[in-house]
Amino acid sequence: MSFDSGLEELSEKFYKLKHLLEDPSQLSVESFVNASKEYSELLPIISVIDEYNAVQKDIKDLQELINNQETDTELKNLAKEEFYELQKQLPKVKHKLKLSLLPKDKDDARNAILEIRAGTGGEEAALFVTDLYRMYIKYAEKKNWKIEQINSSSTGIGGHKEVSLCVSGSNVFAKLKFESGVHRVQRVPETEASGRLHTSAATVAVLPEIEEVDLKIDEKDLRIDVYRSSGPGGQSVNTTDSAVRITHIPSGIVVIQQDEKSQHKNKNKALKVLRARLYDLEKQKRDAEISQLRKSQIGSGDRSERIRTYNFPQSRITDHRINLTLYRLEDIMKEGDLDELIEALIAEDEANKLKNLNI
């Protein structure tokens, strides 16, 4: 099927749905809901198809005007100018149309659970977790997103073994999902007298936040333990059993939550993280089974994959998946100026998907 005939088919489908929805009495409730959903999904695509068809029609009309022997010189020159402008515009509109045809990730509009954990490198890795945490906070502020800290485990001297956040707002998961993976830092620690460069790492996991209605967890699959919360060094910071550890027996996933003074709040936060991890586990299994989807991903999608290096002496950040190097480390780390990196990753992902669509 040619590109243009495929567009005609989509348009026909859209107008059939529109006609159906104009008289909902002939549809069952379920059919009406499904038709409405499909109509809403096609609406923005049809808008771009109409724009593409209009540009093509204008080019054709102008070509006929230019080729017409009876067209006077002044009008012909004006037509030529407009014709060349539209010729330049057409590839951009076609690219925009192709992007609108790409399969959508249904999780893109969701909020996200962001988990940052120290990897190799001891205290330096823990300090790097704090740096990444602050970077994402700054980025979220720029996007007017809401941040809720779910859990944190500090080292007591400025570092964190791990931090978990819930980030809420517009298209959060779409923007943050490519941050999952191993982030590596190269810098000279303040305590390093010889000035030797150290390499440390932290792992970032970005999970779509899943509502309770979207994923039901059977209570009998859970083991819930409560105990007193502890601070750096293991000292008790609470006199009541407010900390909660939930084990999902079938998967072996364990979630610990102790930031809140209330056991009830800790349990709710732990269940929120558990839902996200279970959903992510199923999603990874699904993706692994679909080779085409794997080909369209940036990098391998493996959480153990090294995705980015932050080199402080050179003020350099390199994203290894797209071979992009920026010499703006301070802007990115301290100000959360991540847009250039994130937009480049999104563009690469779209380019890969376009290749797979073969259009």
Curated annotation (Swiss-Prot):
Where are the N5-methylglutamine residues found in this chain? Q235
**Keyword Oxidoreductase attributed:** no
Keywords, sorted A to Z: Cytoplasm, Methylation, Protein biosynthesis
This protein's superkingdom? Answer: Bacteria
PTM summary from the entry reads: Methylated by PrmC. Methylation increases the termination efficiency of RF1.
Q: Where in the cell is it found?
A: Cytoplasm
- Known Pfam families for this protein? PCRF, RF-1
Question: What does the entry list under GO cellular component?
Answer: cytoplasm
* GO MF term (any one): translation release factor activity, codon specific
User: What NCBIfam families does the database record attribute to this sequence?
Assistant: prfA (TIGR00019), PRK00591.1 (NF001859)
PANTHER family xrefs: LD18447P
What this chain does, per the entry, is described as: Peptide chain release factor 1 directs the termination of translation in response to the peptide chain termination codons UAG and UAA.
Family that this chain belongs to: Belongs to the prokaryotic/mitochondrial release factor family.
Q: What is this protein called?
A: Peptide chain release factor 1
Organism per entry: Ehrlichia ruminantium (strain Gardel)
Q: What is the lineage of its organism?
A: Bacteria, Pseudomonadati, Pseudomonadota, Alphaproteobacteria, Rickettsiales
